[in-house]
Amino acid sequence: MSILDYDYIKTLITTNNGEEVSYRWSHGASDMHLGDGLIIYTLINFFKFKVLVCLGSGGGFIPRIMTQARHDLSVEGFYEEVSMEWGDNGSTYLVDAVNGFNGEVDWEDKESLLRRHFHPKFIKDTTENAYYNFFVKQDIKIDLLHIDADHTFEGVKKDFDLYSKIMNKGGIITIHDTDKNYVNNFVEIDGHEGDDLTGPSEFIKTIDKRKFEVMNFFNHGIRKDKPSSTGLTIIRKK
């Protein structure tokens, strides 16, 4: 017996009823392994985070883990309402312009498994417009922010600089694709021009460690015969 429900994981978290969730490999995940998604789940569960925001998601891997973590906290007795949607156990916000920049999404349809089962609040806009015209206007403060949208240095910096202003005290920011060693050793198919992933790894070097705690979770190369994460960096204001 495992502490994890592998049947559930391989049906609804790492696959869409058997079809592999897009880009899950970038999290080091496989059918029965959550990769760095387990770190996101643990942060939400341990700190009882309620307001969760994901900036960019090709396959919806992280948003579904966010919602599952909120749901499980309710089951564990921390909130009265047991729901995948939103209520006293918080909300999951997913921001994506669905413009093909840094990957294609496969969950835009309201009947997609992600939206039908995990019910993220979907904001179809750029991260900058969403910041000023949704989060700021509604005075929403964030417990956990996952940055995985524009992967240029300027894009990552802008998302961090903006959204770090509306984090709750003790809130955590996670940035995906930060392992420079992974990026530098990634092989593309001949003739296919991949997305530029250098921005996240370059940006984290510039974070002021006098103001922020920074912890990197890199596992590239530990098991060369298995998928590994492209890197996850956790940031928290001191």
Predicted regions and their residues:
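Short amphipathic alpha-helical segments that mediate assembly, nucleic-acid/protein binding
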Residues: 5-6, 200
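S-adenosylmethionine/decaboxylated-SAM
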Residues: 31, 41-238
